[in-house]
Each structure stands twice: as structure tokens, then as C-alpha cells.
A protein has these predicted regions:
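Conserved acidic segment of CheY-like receiver
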Residues: 1-21, 54
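Short hydrophobic/Thr-rich beta-strand motif most characteristic of the beta2 strand and flanking loop
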Residues: 28-37
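Acidic, metal-coordinating helix/loop segments flanking the phosphotransfer/catalytic sites
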Residues: 36-53
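His-Asp phosphorelay/catalytic-motif detector in bacterial-type signaling
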Residues: 52, 76-81
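Conserved phosphotransfer microenvironments
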Residues: 52-73
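Alpha4 helix (beta4-alpha4-beta5 surface) of REC/receiver domains from two-component response regulators
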Residues: 87-104
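C-terminal output helix
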Residues: 108-117
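The C-terminal output helix
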Residues: 118-129
Length: 129
């Protein structure tokens, strides 16, 4: 299953990759992680239908994951579900505005990320399935 990870920060992308591992739970397919650092790269991938699930860093620069999530939900047909990583727990209401399907906060809790991502992976068949 293709999991796209969006953040300008290579350390955040590495933390997400480590939290996901080969698969975030035993009952979901293996994750093929695709890292992107820019909003244009993310939208090229989404336009091509190359993602099953998105993990978006709300603190990404210059395009934050919240705005990117909302834009994707508005513009991409059959947009993949999105897990949004917000700057603090109190920003959960912004995740609602952005139409994220799941939310966790920084600092990244690997167990919480894996749990939320596995839930999204269970809900959506893989591209090409």
C-alpha cells in the first residue's frame, strides 16, 4: 500500500518512516513509503493516483500540511485519506477544518501514528486493487 509522507523536514519524514516500519499493524498490507518535501511534488503524485494514504506535516514550510490537506480534499478526485500531524494537541480543530481523516500532534508518538495510520489503511483498498 502506497503511503505518501509530506514534510519539508527530513527529520520528520524519518520519524514517520520509523514509526510505520514495514507495516503499522499486522492486519494491514506492507507500506511502500513515498517521501515528498514539496507541495508541487505531492500534487503531481496525487494527480497521478499514486497514493493510498497521506501523512501530512502540519508544520511543513512553506505550505503547511493543513492547507495542503484541504486543497487535496477539494481538488483531487477520490482523494486518499489523510493523517495530519499538528503542532500541538490544541490544534485539532484546525485538522477538522482541513478535512483530515485522522490527527496526531508533535512530538510524534510512534505508537499513536501507527495506530491512526493502520485505521486509515483498513478503510481504503490499495491503488490498483
Amino acid at each position: 500500500m502506497k503511503v505518501v509522507v509530506y514534510s519539508h523536514d527530513a527529520d520528520v519524514r524519518a520519524q514517520v518512516r520509523l514509526a510505520i516500519g514495514r507495516r503499522p499493524a499486522m492486519d494491514v498490507p506492507e507500506a511502500e513509503i513515498i517521501e515528498v518535501a514539496t507541495q508541487p511534488a505531492l500534487f503531481r503524485l496525487l494527480d497521478a493516483g499514486g497514493a493510498d494514504v497521506m501523512v501530512l506535516d502540519g508544520e511543513a514550510q512553506p505550505y503547511g500540511g493543513m492547507g495542503v490537506c484541504r486543497q487535496a480534499k477539494d481538488e483531487i478526485y477520490n482523494c486518499p485519506p489523510a493523517l495530519l500531524i499538528v503542532g500541538r494537541a490544541d490544534d485539532g480543530w484546525l485538522a477538522t477544518w482541513s478535512r483530515a481523516d485522522a490527527v496526531i500532534s508533535h512530538p510524534i508518538d510512534p505508537v499513536a501514528l501507527a495506530h491512526e495510520l493502520a485505521g486509515l489503511m483498513r478503510e481504503r483498498p490499495a491503488v490498483g486493487s
